[in-house]
């Protein structure tokens, strides 16, 4: 298969779609705070800044493996997935990895963030139960293919697909036993792949795994308090989220310790963790709302960053959660503190925060412990355009604010933005040509990158940006109804097609001096008066061609 070929006239056709201004009809408040974005490209960033895309094993790979908790969850409870689908095939990267690396090469990407499937490597969850050579061979082939194309692998050790065997045996992350099993699994990964992998991420979005899996019950393993949702598989949202997070932190720290003691000196790599953080904007200028915004940050990003930098949970969590919050022993605190070389930040949206007293409304729950209420609106006006899925508002300035907050509060750590993106709904009524036009996605990336550059200019130690995602894929409880990809996937044939955003990235990231001089500003995107993202679907200027 081959990549799309663009002749000079087609390039001109593309650039005709790309205007010198990047104006979005944002809601009034956002329009007042977002600066019109001038032209810039990759040469506007430091020379060592890395651009990549991100993916995960369960969402991408397909092919046979023993079950993870997500295999079990999607098969046992298909009604909990928007379209009843699962990741059995996903986008079949297991068989299409060479094509996918070719896409990355076409897009001029520097790096690819992938994850390793724990049950694909260790069917029982432990090396004592045998190592799956087929799984090891797949990751070796993928890593080698990336390196052969000058693409740097960033590897996540755990992106939510825990072996079902360990969940069945002792409850997974509810049990402290997981810490040793996680460490040993990571040790094996370092041994197998660390000669070529120089950037490791221990855990992806531990707060989301914890909150959605053990408080809301909408992600595997589907646990929550019965009073919140009687269809959950069991659970207690007042204790389990904090316990799971505690064991995730200890698993992370034990893994970092192994890497630094056994591998880092001779493998010359670095290791960190990826956290999703929603930026918190006080609903008003009141002291109460400002404190609410800080508490929200404490209960999300601070939940993990405070232990990693100070060896203990945020004071607000200790006070409000009380005895339900696990405590680090002296030795554990020493192990956890400083256990990172970098912090990965996954940023998608921001929210308004105000105080609420939930202390007497309901049984104790992580969902109410912070005593805040968050909203996407202030006085009926959204903080930013709402994406089709409804949970995300596009607020690029929040990324700059978050990066500068981390710089000031956590002593300016090395940061990679390990995910950023926006969704669109799968719409079978659209033609293929229409499905490839995503100027709103280009505009969103352009503005986020503008604010990343601004944060760097203000001293934030940011060294990379990964778009979510390379391809449309299985989006957890949204199944295949939500498309985040820069490249369109026909889920029946598994054929890949470049969206306009993929080709925009190709030229934004071009190193060729003549191409780099071109104005690759974001095209104008259309937004409805209700601030729900919509797009005028125009036929592309190039022939639709699979690769």
From Swiss-Prot:
Alphabetical list of SUPFAM superfamilies matching this protein: (Trans)glycosidases
Signal peptide: 1-31
Keywords from the named record: Disulfide bond, Glycoprotein, Glycosidase, Hydrolase, Signal
Residues at the active site: 205, 419
Glycosylation sites: 72, 132, 175, 285, 490
Binding site for a beta-D-glucoside: 59, 159, 204-205, 348, 419, 468, 475-476, 484
Control of this protein's activity: Not inhibited by iron, calcium, mercury, manganese, zinc or EDTA.
Pfam families: Glyco_hydro_1 (PF00232)
Reactions performed catalytically: 7-[beta-D-apiofuranosyl-(1->6)-beta-D-glucopyranosyloxy]isoflavonoid + H2O = a 7-hydroxyisoflavonoid + beta-D-apiofuranosyl-(1->6)-D-glucose
A GO molecular-function descriptor: beta-apiosyl-beta-glucosidase activity
UniProt temperature dependence: Optimum temperature is 65 degrees Celsius.
pH-activity profile: Optimum pH is 5.0-6.0. Half maximum activity is seen at pH 3.5 and 6.5.
Disulfide bond entries: 224-232
EC code: 3.2.1.161
Biological process terms in GO annotation: carbohydrate metabolic process
Enzyme class, broadest EC rank: hydrolase
Subunit architecture: Homotetramer.
Homology family: Belongs to the glycosyl hydrolase 1 family.
Function per UniProt: Hydrolyzes dalpatein 7-O-beta-D-apiofuranosyl-(1->6)-beta-D-glucopyranoside and dalnigrein 7-O-beta-D-apiofuranosyl-(1->6)-beta-D-glucopyranoside. Also has activity towards pNP-beta-D-fucoside and pNP-beta-D-glucoside, but not pNP-beta-cellobioside.
Name by which UniProt lists this protein: Isoflavonoid 7-O-beta-apiosyl-glucoside beta-glycosidase
């Amino acid at each position: 298969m081959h990549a799309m070929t663009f002749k000079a006239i087609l390039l001109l056709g593309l650039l005709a779609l790309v205007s010198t201004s990047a104006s979005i009809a944002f809601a009034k408040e956002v329009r007042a705070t977002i600066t019109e974005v001038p032209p810039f490209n990759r040469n506007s960033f430091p020379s060592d800044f890395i651009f990549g895309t991100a993916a995960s094993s369960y969402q991408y790979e397909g092919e046979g493996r023993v079950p993870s908790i997500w295999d079990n969850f999607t098969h046992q409870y298909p009604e909990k997935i928007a379209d009843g689908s699962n990741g059995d095939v996903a986008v079949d990267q297991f068989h299409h990895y060479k094509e996918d690396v070719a896409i990355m090469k076409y897009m001029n990407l520097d790096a690819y963030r992938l994850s390793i499937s724990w049950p694909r490597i260790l069917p029982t969850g432990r090396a004592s139960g045998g190592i799956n050579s087929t799984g090891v061979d797949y990751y070796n082939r993928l890593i080698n293919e990336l390196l052969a194309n000058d693409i740097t692998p960033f590897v996540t050790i755990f992106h939510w697909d825990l072996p079902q065997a360990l969940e069945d045996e002792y409850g997974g992350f509810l049990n402290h036993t997981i810490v040793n099993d996680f460490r040993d699994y990571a040790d094996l990964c370092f041994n197998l792949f660390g000669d070529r992998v120089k950037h490791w991420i221990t855990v992806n979005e531990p707060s989301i795994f914890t909150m959605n899996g053990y408080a809301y019950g909408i992600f595997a393993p589907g646990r929550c308090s019965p009073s919140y949702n009687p269809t959950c598989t069991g659970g207690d949202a007042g204790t389990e989220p904090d316990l799971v997070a505690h064991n995730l932190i200890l698993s992370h720290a034990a893994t970092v310790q192994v890497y630094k003691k056994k591998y880092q000196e001779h493998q010359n790599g670095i290791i960190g963790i990826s956290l999703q953080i929603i930026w918190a904007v006080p609903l008003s200028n009141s002291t109460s709302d400002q404190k609410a915004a800080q508490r929200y940050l404490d209960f999300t990003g601070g939940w993990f960053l405070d232990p990693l930098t100070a060896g203990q949970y945020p004071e607000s969590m200790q006070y409000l959660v009380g005895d339900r919050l696990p405590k680090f022993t002296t030795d554990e605190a020493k192990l956890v503190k400083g256990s990172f070389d970098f912090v990965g930040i996954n940023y998608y949206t921001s929210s308004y925060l105000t105080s609420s007293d939930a202390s007497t409304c309901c049984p104790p729950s992580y969902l109410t412990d912070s005593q805040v209420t968050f909203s996407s609106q202030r006085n009926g006006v959204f903080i930013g355009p709402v994406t089709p899925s409804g949970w995300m508002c596009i607020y690029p300035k929040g990324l700059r604010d978050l990066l500068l907050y981390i710089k000031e509060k956590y002593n300016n750590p090395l940061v990679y933005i390990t995910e950023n993106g926006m969704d669109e709904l799968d719409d079978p009524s659209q033609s293929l040509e229409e499905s490839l036009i995503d100027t709103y996605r280009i505009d969103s990336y352009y503005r986020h990158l503008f604010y990343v550059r601004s944060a760097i200019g203000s001293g934030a130690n940011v060294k990379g940006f990964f778009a979510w995602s390379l391809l449309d894929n299985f989006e957890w409880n949204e199944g295949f109804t939500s498309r985040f990809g820069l490249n369109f996937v026909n889920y029946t044939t598994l054929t890949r097609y470049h969206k306009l955003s993929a080709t925009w990235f190709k030229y934004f990231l071009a190193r060729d001096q003549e191409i780099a001089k071109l104005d690759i500003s974001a095209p104008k995107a259309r937004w409805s008066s209700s601030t729900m993202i919509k797009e005028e679907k125009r036929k592309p200027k190039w022939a639709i061609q699979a690769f």
